[in-house]
């Protein structure tokens, strides 16, 4: 089979103005970035207020494995298949981060015959949104250190600066650094560090803001430090929320592209689901809901991460409902959770697959807590055997369909589309987290009901930070749990369906502008590192200027 990039280059793309026109976006609301990419002016969304929302289909997955599950490929294929069936559908996705593109994961534009295009642009710089977020984030850092040097009127305690710097790259060497070295001219030396841009609170804010006014207010509410007299220092105290908004005024407008079969796609924002809320911007989702009958959106990593945060938090902020959830699984992933090593996953092993189905079963049970229909999408690989597929079908305790989007595009996803249409609901999903719950109650609910832990343990650091949050009035903020994506638990080594263990919260981080508290579990890092052999070594440019090795 041809490579992703070869398939992408053979696709017959329409001009983006035609794609936009087909779904009712007037050209005056488009800001083109070449022939095939455009931004949609936020003002257009306001003209659609009286239109009824379409139905929302959330795509998530079982606990990810090194073999890959194909969630984005399935999302794109499902949206294309709905259109092939005569329905109207738009897919909404997150923007890829350069860190994973050059790291172990690779690109995030789908694969095979189920891609969003132009994939090279989308996977690399795209429309510059992530650059704008990085610039805004680092402006805050620069102003903080400048303020401390020139008088420090806000009495900022340099040892209590919470705001780290950022860049859109995996670079473990920057996790902990010292800034201000080299004498008085360079500022006050202090400990600092970098996080990846996808983990920036500004990324979360951009994806949660409903308009420019809301964006500016949220930016102003970011807590960056504590003063010597124990007062919180916010961005609005530094008087730079206007400058930050200026840097982001174009980035807040959603990006429109197309799939390989010319289905419209909004790609906007890219928070990770293991360290943030893990889905594209609310603006992009709301715009899609106003323009089509069926919106397919994706939440990062597994159902215990992205889907939980989407169902408990994102939908509440965005004021929309989920009408069906698609849970992506693979035979390989099930065998991996059943104890089979990565290099042996291509060998038939029905017993291991059935053992690994406990992971699938757990995610199905968790999703049903939200009163939402669940459809399992089994992403089929060439190595899957007839015996394995038969055993899966016999033991899967939810409506399910086989998916071949990678090799057949929409034609390989028709079965899934029909199964979703048969099961989709008009009823409202029910979050399991109540806004009035305390931080501890929210974590306890997630740990016992979703992560299947015995109890929650708080380190001394976490207990101290909890007191800080309560002292400053943040005790009922929504909670985003940052934990490993490789296990339902807080330990990446606990595969399949761990039960009856202690779930440890080691620290908390406040995202007052985004409107949530991050509970850090296990050893999760907000600045990833590159693998021993990163994907970067596979990427090149030929003599004609064509990128090769990107997938």
From Swiss-Prot:
Binding site for ATP: 65-72
InterPro entries, per the entry: Formate_THF_ligase, Formate_THF_ligase_CS, P-loop_NTPase
Enzyme Commission code: 6.3.4.3
EC class name: ligase
Keywords: ATP-binding, Ligase, Nucleotide-binding, One-carbon metabolism
Annotated metabolic or biological route of this protein: One-carbon metabolism; tetrahydrofolate interconversion
An individual GO BP term: tetrahydrofolate interconversion
Keyword Acyltransferase: no
CDD domains: FTHFS
GO terms for MF: ATP binding; formate-tetrahydrofolate ligase activity
Pfam family name, one: FTHFS
Catalytic activity: (6S)-5,6,7,8-tetrahydrofolate + formate + ATP = (6R)-10-formyltetrahydrofolate + ADP + phosphate
Family matches, as SUPFAM superfamilies: P-loop containing nucleoside triphosphate hydrolases
NCBIfam families: PRK13505.1
Family the UniProt entry places it in: Belongs to the formate--tetrahydrofolate ligase family.
Protein's name according to its UniProt entry: Formate--tetrahydrofolate ligase
Gene encoding the protein: fhs
């Amino acid at each position: 089979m041809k490579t992703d990039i070869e398939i992408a280059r053979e696709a017959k793309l329409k001009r983006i103005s035609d794609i936009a026109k087909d779904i009712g976006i007037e050209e005056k609301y488009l800001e083109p970035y070449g022939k095939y990419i455009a931004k949609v002016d936020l003002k257009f969304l306001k003209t659609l207020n009286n239109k009824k929302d379409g139905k929302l289909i959330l795509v998530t997955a079982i606990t990810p494995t090194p073999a890959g599950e194909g969630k984005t490929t399935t999302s794109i294929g499902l949206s294309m298949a709905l259109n092939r069936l005569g329905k109207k559908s738009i897919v909404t996705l997150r923007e890829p981060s350069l860190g994973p593109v050059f790291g172990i994961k690779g690109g995030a534009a789908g694969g095979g015959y189920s891609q969003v295009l132009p994939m090279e642009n989308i996977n690399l710089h795209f429309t510059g949104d992530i650059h704008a977020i990085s610039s805004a984030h680092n402006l805050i850092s620069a102003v903080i250190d400048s303020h401390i040097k020139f008088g420090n009127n806000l009495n900022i305690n340099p040892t209590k600066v919470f705001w780290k710097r950022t860049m859109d790259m995996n670079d473990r060497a920057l996790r902990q650094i010292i800034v201000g070295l080299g004498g008085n001219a360079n500022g006050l030396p202090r400990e600092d560090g970098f996080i990846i841009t996808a983990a920036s609170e500004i990324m979360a804010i951009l994806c949660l803001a409903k308009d420019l006014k809301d964006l500016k207010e949220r930016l102003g509410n970011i807590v960056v430090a504590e003063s010597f007299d124990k007062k919180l220092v916010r961005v609005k105290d530094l008087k730079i929320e206007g400058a930050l908004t200026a840097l982001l005024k174009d980035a807040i407008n959603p990006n429109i592209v197309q799939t390989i079969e010319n289905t419209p796609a909004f790609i906007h924002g890219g928070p990770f689901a293991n360290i943030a809320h893990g889905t594209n911007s609310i603006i992009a989702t709301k715009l899609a809901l106003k323009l089509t009958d069926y919106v397919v959106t994706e939440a990062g990593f597994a159902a215990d991460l992205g889907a939980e945060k989407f169902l408990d938090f994102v939908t509440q902020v965005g004021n929309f409902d989920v009408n069906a959830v698609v849970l992506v699984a693979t035979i390989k992933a099930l065998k991996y959770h059943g104890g089979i090593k990565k290099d042996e996953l291509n060998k038939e092993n029905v017993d291991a697959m059935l053992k690994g189905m406990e992971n699938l079963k757990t995610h199905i049970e968790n999703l049903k807590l939200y009163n939402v229909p669940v459809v399992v999408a089994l992403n089929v690989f060439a190595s899957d055997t007839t015996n394995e597929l038969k055993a899966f079908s016999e033991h899967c305790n939810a409506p399910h369909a086989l998916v071949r989007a990678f090799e057949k595009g929409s034609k390989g996803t028709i079965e899934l589309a029909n199964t979703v249409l048969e099961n989709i609901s008009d009823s409202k999903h029910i979050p399991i987290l109540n806004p009035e719950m305390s931080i501890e109650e929210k974590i306890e609910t997630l740990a016992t009901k979703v992560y299947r832990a015995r109890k929650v343990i708080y380190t001394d650091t976490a207990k101290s930070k909890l007191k800080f949050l309560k002292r400053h009035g943040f005790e009922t903020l929504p909670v985003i749990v940052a934990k490993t994506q490789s296990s339902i638990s807080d330990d990446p080594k606990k595969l399949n369906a761990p039960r009856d263990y202690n779930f440890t919260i080691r620290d908390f981080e406040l995202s007052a502008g985004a409107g949530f508290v991050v509970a850090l579990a296990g050893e999760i890092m907000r600045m990833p590192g590159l693998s021993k052999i990163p994907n970067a070594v596979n990427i090149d440019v030929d003599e004609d200027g064509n990128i090769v090795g990107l997938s």
